[in-house]
A protein has these predicted regions:
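Terminal targeting signals and extreme-terminal segments of soluble enzymes
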Residues: 1-138
Length: 138
């Protein structure tokens, strides 16, 4: 949305995918520990009732947690989602700024654990946790 200001520290994401391309623009903010994703909610992000779609939340939480684990592992490996759980706490609507804020719990040579909170205008609307399998790049 052209009239909406992108919060400080956020830039266009550097790793798109065929799944998330229709939802662009998606932004990212790098911290020493993680990658925070953000976007202004628009009609393509919603369900038939005008609320943010759970599938969007699931995809963005998977992406944010996976990229954050990869950042901590210095990008030397690939990650595959083994399991993920999401609790939908509240809803979000068109025009709100959505962020996915990740905390990497533990990384190892074969597995990585992460959790995140999804916020709309700063209010928590979902939480998720995931386990990723660490795979050596070929």
């Amino acid at each position: 949305m052209p009239d909406q200001i992108i919060p400080e520290g956020f830039v266009r994401q550097t790793r798109g995918s065929p799944l998330t391309d229709p939802w662009e623009p998606i932004y990212q903010k790098q911290t020493p520990e993680a990658i925070i994703l953000g976007l202004w909610l628009a009609k393509p992000h919603t369900n038939a009732r005008g609320f943010v779609h759970g599938g969007l939340i699931a995809a963005l939480t998977d992406k944010a947690m996976g990229h954050s684990c990869g950042r901590q592992l210095r990008g030397a490996v690939s990650l595959v989602t083994v399991s993920m759980a999401i609790d939908f706490i509240s809803s979000a609507q068109i025009g709100q700024w959505l962020t996915v804020e990740t905390d990497v719990i533990k990384t190892g040579s074969t597995i990585c654990f992460a959790q995140c909170f999804v916020k709309a205008d700063g209010a928590v609307i979902a939480r998720a946790n995931a386990t990723f399998r660490v795979v050596k790049k070929k």
